[in-house]
Amino acid sequence: MGKCRPSGDRRPQGSLVMIMNSQEESAMNFNEAALKLHEEHHGKIEVVSKVPVKTRDDLSTAYTPGVAEPCRKIHDNKKDVYKYTAKGNLVAVVSDGTAVLGLGNIGPEAAMPVMEGKSVLFKEFGGVDAFPICLDTTDTEEIIKAVKYIAPC
């Protein structure tokens, strides 16, 4: 036989035993926890209203017909967009998925969890509302154009 096995070892002969250090075990635990978190919550971000919309009056004030008045004010003075909307506290986290953390070129779909994570960091540590936007192009000019269209000056 020539194989040295401790007495009482019930594993089948030829079974693989993995020995990991605590750092590797920790990484595996974070990986499993991250998959569970993302699956259970379908990502890490959501849009939540700052104002109640529980009654008909609430709805009429937050949406139509009441919303027309701030629209008119912004139409008359474009700078009022910062007074009447969240625009002054919004940023876009834009990626084409080609240089994602230590993952490299993983594409826009696979980049979304990282961009959501960055959005969470903006909110938690800076109080800034951030939206992840993953573009399906690697053309620099197209990316610039898309960002300009998203946020006109």
Positions of the model-derived regions?
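Short, low-complexity intrinsically disordered segments enriched in A/P/G/S/L with frequent Arg
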Residues: 10, 14-15
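N-terminal ligand-binding/catalytic initiation module
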Residues: 25-153
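Residue-level detector of intrinsically disordered terminal segments
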Residues: 17-19, 27
